Design a protein with these regions (language model features):
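Charged helix-capping and loop-helix junction motifs
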Residues: 1-4, 34-39, 75-76
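Substrate-binding cleft of secreted/luminal carbohydrate-active enzymes
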Residues: 7-30, 44-131
């Protein structure tokens, strides 16, 4: 059996460089909202050398996942991005999966996320990679 003690990893210097919880919930997920999950992760006691990145679910964009809550808006990923980067404990985001960047069904959602990231670009601390 595999056991992952994330709290220990976060507290002890040198165990990990960063953690990236997969917050693959929509803002309105009936089981657990994105914001509630983000709050729980950001309240962990994290060593200053460990960065917290947030994993976003690009593959769920414009899908019927999470009881259809991804169908209500084309700004879910953009709103989650804004929520994440406004949290002082969050160092950035990671998007899963690469295929979402080219998915026709997710194109509006991905474009809105890209726009939100461009509008928030701090050239000293963030990097955006152009989608080709």
């Amino acid at each position: 059996q595999i056991y992952a003690d994330v709290k220990t990893w976060c507290i002890c210097k040198g165990f990990v460089d960063y953690i990236c919880p997969q917050l693959y919930y929509s803002l309105d997920n009936p089981a657990l909202t994105f914001e509630d999950s983000l709050t729980a992760w950001s309240e962990l006691d994290i060593n200053k050398s460990v960065k917290l990145y947030v994993g976003l679910a690009g593959y769920k964009a414009n899908s019927d996942a999470d009881e259809g809550t991804w169908l209500y808006s084309n700004n879910i990923l953009a709103d989650e991005y804004k929520t994440a980067v406004n949290n002082e404990k969050v160092s950035g985001i990671m998007l899963y999966s690469y295929s979402a960047l080219k998915d026709e069904n997710a194109s509006t959602e991905i474009a809105n996320l890209t726009k939100a990231m461009s509008n928030n670009l701090d050239t000293e601390n963030q990097t955006t990679v152009p989608i080709q």
